[in-house]
Amino acid sequence: MTAPTTRKDLMIVNMGPQHPSMHGVLRLIVTLDGEDVVDCEPILGYLHRGMEKIAENRTIIQYLPYVTRWDYLATMFTEAITINGPEQLGNIQVPKRASYIRVIMLELSRIASHLLWLGPFMADIGAQTPFFYIFRERELIYDLFEAATGMRMMHNYFRIGGVAADLPYGWIDKCLDFCDYFLTGVAEYQKLITRNPIFLERVEGVGIIGRDEAVNWGLSGPMLRASGIEWDLRKVDHYESYDEFDWQVQWQREGDSLARYLVRIGEMTESIKIIQQALEGIPGGPYENLEMRRFDRLKDPEWNDFEYRFISKKPSPTFELSKQELYVRVEAPKGELGIFLIGDQSVFPWRWKIRPPGFINLQILPQLVKRMKLADIMTILGSIDIIMGEVDR
């Protein structure tokens, strides 16, 4: 009797786009040899909404509500990048108080984004408890956002030359209380997760990205810093008031999923340090550069006429974009969020190119998952931290 010949059959599996374990509407076509991944092809575009084309037919103030739908978990950063470009094109000065308020809001948004990365990431690899814990702290941040901006998500708070409204009475004390409480929360996460042997088994040495590899693929944010490169745009580009605060760039050498986790956990602690310093040193004065003109107009007897009050007391100005090119960027929670802006002596931009961090970081996924196990795909994908709103735009 002859021995049976072994056959090598490859199996093709679809992951997503409607599966709850996927991060948004991402589809992966995975080719498997048993449990080993032979090939992986990401299919994008399920959430494409033409955001760049919409920008070319809107003024900046009209476009602001749209941008919060890119990365809908860190909306302050998309707003910041949208108004930073026109501010630089028009050389518009931002008052010191407004800059401090922006820094506080950006760092709160960074913490909220990292929290909602941590919970699902832990759930992906089998730990359910942190998923419920992170919502406890995240709700407190959203309460602060709601008090200051009127919205829990999609805040529409930044304006060219400042912010839409000043911080309400008692908000600073409330935020300082949150900072003290949150530091104990981060310590609790580290006690629960960082030295957990089951967690370490799933993430240590999984999805390793070398230093040169990270640069060649154009990675940014925690993906880059976890591979041994100390690069943070808050230190490099010196935007807003970040130079006035004492804080450290978080980075690791290993380049694996554990290193990316440690970078993000460290960033949450550093963000709290920045917020505390900003709250304690926040200066007085106007919260946007048009506010002083409004103060002067209060003396105008027509200011309180019924007809004028009925139309509008606070019209939002429309700025003309000068004829030049500009690339602006901020350090978003997921990496470098950039805008390439071309003005055309019009209120509408001639070209508005978005450089989303998630889209660039996702490119390395097929290379990372090859020769890994099927179960490692969710670990690696989770450690990249993507939001399909900004990947597909």
Curated annotation (Swiss-Prot):
Annotated keywords: Chloroplast, Membrane, NAD, NADP, Plastid, Plastoquinone, Quinone, Thylakoid, Translocase, Transport
Chief subcellular location: plastid
InterPro entries named among the record's database cross-references: NADH_Q_OxRdtase_suD, NADH_UbQ_OxRdtase_49kDa_CS, NDH1_su_D/H, NiFe-Hase_large
GO annotations of cellular component type: chloroplast thylakoid membrane
The reaction(s) this protein catalyses: a plastoquinone + NADH + (n+1) H(+)(in) = a plastoquinol + NAD(+) + n H(+)(out); a plastoquinone + NADPH + (n+1) H(+)(in) = a plastoquinol + NADP(+) + n H(+)(out)
GO BP field: photosynthesis, light reaction
UniProt-annotated location(s): Plastid, Chloroplast thylakoid membrane
Disulfide bonds: none
Gene3D superfamilies: Cytochrome-c3 Hydrogenase, chain B
Membrane topology, from the record: Peripheral membrane protein
EC number in record: 7.1.1.-
Annotated GO MF terms: NAD binding; oxidoreductase activity, acting on NAD(P)H, quinone or similar compound as acceptor; quinone binding
Classification via PROSITE patterns: COMPLEX1_49K
Subunit: NDH is composed of at least 16 different subunits, 5 of which are encoded in the nucleus.
PANTHER family membership: NADH DEHYDROGENASE [UBIQUINONE] IRON-SULFUR PROTEIN 2, MITOCHONDRIAL, NADH-UBIQUINONE OXIDOREDUCTASE 49 KDA SUBUNIT
Family the entry assigns: Belongs to the complex I 49 kDa subunit family.
Matching HAMAP family: NDH1_NuoD
Task performed by this protein: NDH shuttles electrons from NAD(P)H:plastoquinone, via FMN and iron-sulfur (Fe-S) centers, to quinones in the photosynthetic chain and possibly in a chloroplast respiratory chain. The immediate electron acceptor for the enzyme in this species is believed to be plastoquinone. Couples the redox reaction to proton translocation, and thus conserves the redox energy in a proton gradient.
Protein name: NAD(P)H-quinone oxidoreductase subunit H, chloroplastic
Lineage per the UniProt record: Eukaryota, Viridiplantae, Streptophyta, Embryophyta, Tracheophyta
The gene coding this protein: ndhH
